[in-house]
Amino acid sequence: MSWLKSMMEKEPPEPENPIGTVVIGNIEPDMHDTAKEAVRRSLKRAGFKTIDVGKSVAPQVFIDKAKETNADIIALSVNTVPAKNNLAKLDEALKAAGLKDKIMLIMGGAAIKKEDATAMGALFGKNKEEGVEIAKKAMAGKKK
């Protein structure tokens, strides 16, 4: 029932002085956005500006939006095996755009494990609380 509670929560306000910008979405063909929405709201409450690109999003859209908004982090929700299979395309798009070492990649979801994220050079959040803490630590390291 915690997912229902999180979906019924009010939309948090935009932070006045964001600690970072996060592009967040579900990689295609994943249409399950309940967890992504919970993470997005939690990031917003923690002081991040969030740019939601939606569900079933092509890898290049994440890249384009990250460049357009000068994002610090791309956060992915990966809840299906076909979506997991598209992570290699995202990795290639990050490399082609020259963003692989410039933007933090955080992922989580039912179809992915920590080992999958690590293999891509990404960080893994098993839940919304862990995802927010990882994002905060990433920004703290970036500010140094």
Segments the model singles out, each with a brief description of its role:
Residues 1-16:
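Long amphipathic alpha-helical segments
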Residues 18-21, 102:
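Phosphate-coordination loops involved in phosphoryl transfer and adenosine-cofactor binding
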Residues 24-27:
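Short hydrophobic segments within beta-strands
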Residues 29-33:
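N-terminal ligand-binding lobe of clamshell/alpha-beta domains
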Residues 34-42:
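Short, solvent-exposed amphipathic alpha-helices that sit
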Residues 42-46, 52-122:
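Cofactor-cradling patches in redox/metallo enzymes
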Residues 123-128:
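Short acidic-hydrophobic, aromatic-tinged amphipathic segments that line or gate anion-handling sites
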Residues 134-144:
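A charged, well-structured terminal subsegment
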